[in-house]
């Protein structure tokens, strides 16, 4: 196998994320969101409803397993374990970039395995840069949707990762072609929700305006504070000078909470909060400041490398924390949580004042 192949790279990413310190050294700024405790609660904890509807699917909680992997036999096992847990809890999940299976059809089952184990919300995944670099069109989207019977399609934007990755594609000029491609897909193949997805560096207000004009239905902010792809690529790089270069961007990006505020100021569609979402409290805070749903990846990857039961345990813990936080803020359902009172402090307050 060529060590520079996409397939090998997918395996490297799994190994690095499981064994190395790849998380940002700075936080998500969710620590600057203070939910106001309700001393009387006026709720029955057992009756609190965490369910939402998004992309035509009802989920038992506003929680999606964010895009992680695909494209290697080991990835098939990970996706299978996640899908089993998602089906049990009626949540959603995304798959990793499907580029590997576009170029090598024998890798399709590392993605399609998810539909063997769940009928819940599945989100496909393609890279924005490939529509420029490789002249992808709506038929590539169609193939990717069919591969996993996707309910929605994420188009990920990862300029930092591509700039640092030894084999990266760095021509992000001309992304406005996505407007025609998305429109063509919807006309030819039937409408599907399109999600603009960041992968750890966040979207700004300016980005949100552009993405809205392109025709995206939802935005996954993918803010900083969780997994740093600069860190992931740092561990893959062999050249010392390139390592030092990559290390300069270890903490680059818009923190998740700030990106939620940035996007929410210019975009009215669903907002998914990813990037350092580790607890149910993080979910509650994200929703209170403007997100509709949240996603988490790294803790799930580590669990999925063990078993589906381990994935279920992590997700159940987060849902329990979310329900408890709603109970402590007097919120009976997610709509009430969206209106929960909070105080912004420190850097996040300063950030909001300058949007």
UniProtKB/Swiss-Prot annotation:
InterPro entries: Aldolase_TIM (IPR013785), FMN-dep_DH (IPR000262), IPdP_isomerase (IPR011179)
Subcellular localization(s) per the UniProt record: Cytoplasm
Catalysed conversion reaction: isopentenyl diphosphate = dimethylallyl diphosphate
Chain positions recorded as FMN binding sites: 67-69, 97, 125, 197, 227, 276-278, 297-298
Reported function: Involved in the biosynthesis of isoprenoids. Catalyzes the 1,3-allylic rearrangement of the homoallylic substrate isopentenyl (IPP) to its allylic isomer, dimethylallyl diphosphate (DMAPP).
Lineage, top ranks: Archaea, Methanobacteriati, Methanobacteriota, Methanomada group, Methanococci
Key words of the record: Cytoplasm, Flavoprotein, FMN, Isomerase, Isoprene biosynthesis, Magnesium, Metal-binding, NADP
Record text on subunit structure and interactions: Homooctamer. Dimer of tetramers.
Enzyme Commission no: 5.3.3.2
Binding site for substrate: 9-10, 97-99, 161
Needed cofactors: FMN; NADPH; Mg(2+)
Record protein name field: Isopentenyl-diphosphate delta-isomerase
Any one Gene Ontology cellular component term annotated for this protein: cytoplasm
């Amino acid at each position: 196998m060529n060590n520079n192949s996409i397939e090998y790279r997918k395996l490297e990413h799994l190994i690095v994320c499981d064994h190395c310190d790849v998380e940002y050294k700075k936080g998500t700024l969710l620590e600057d969101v203070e939910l106001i405790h309700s001393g009387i609660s006026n709720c029955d904890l057992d009756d609190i409803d965490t369910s939402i509807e998004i992309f035509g699917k009802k989920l038992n909680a506003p929680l999606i397993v964010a895009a992680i992997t695909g494209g290697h036999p080991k990835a098939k096992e990970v996706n299978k374990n996640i899908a089993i847990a998602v089906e049990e809890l009626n949540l959603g999940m995304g798959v990793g970039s499907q580029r590997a299976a576009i170029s090598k059809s024998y890798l399709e089952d590392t993605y399609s395995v998810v539909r063997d184990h769940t009928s819940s919300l599945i989100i496909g995944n393609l890279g924005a840069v490939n529509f420029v670099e490789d002249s992808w069109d709506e038929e590539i989207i169609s193939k990717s949707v069919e591969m996993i019977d996707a309910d929605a399609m994420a188009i990920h934007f990862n300029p930092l990762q591509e700039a640092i990755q030894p084999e990266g594609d760095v021509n992000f000029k001309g992304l406005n072609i996505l407007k025609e491609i998305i429109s063509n897909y919807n006309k030819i193949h039937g409408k599907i929700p399109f999600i603009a997805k960041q992968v750890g560096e966040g979207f700004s207000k300016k980005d949100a305006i552009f993405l809205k004009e392109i025709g995206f239905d939802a935005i996954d902010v993918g803010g900083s504070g969780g997994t740093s792809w600069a860190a992931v690529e740092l561990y893959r790089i062999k050249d010392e000078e390139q390592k030092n270069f990559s290390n300069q961007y270890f903490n680059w990006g818009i923190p998740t909470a700030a990106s939620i505020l940035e996007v929410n100021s210019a975009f009215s569609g669903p907002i998914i909060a990813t990037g350092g979402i580790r607890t149910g409290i993080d979910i509650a805070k994200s929703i209170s400041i403007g997100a509709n749903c949240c996603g988490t990846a790294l803790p799930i990857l580590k669990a999925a490398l063990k078993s589906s039961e381990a994935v279920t345990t992590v997700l159940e813990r987060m849902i329990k924390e979310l329900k408890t936080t709603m109970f402590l803020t007097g919120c009976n359902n997610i709509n009430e949580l969206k209106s929960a009172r909070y105080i912004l402090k420190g850097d996040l307050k300063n950030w909001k004042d300058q949007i």
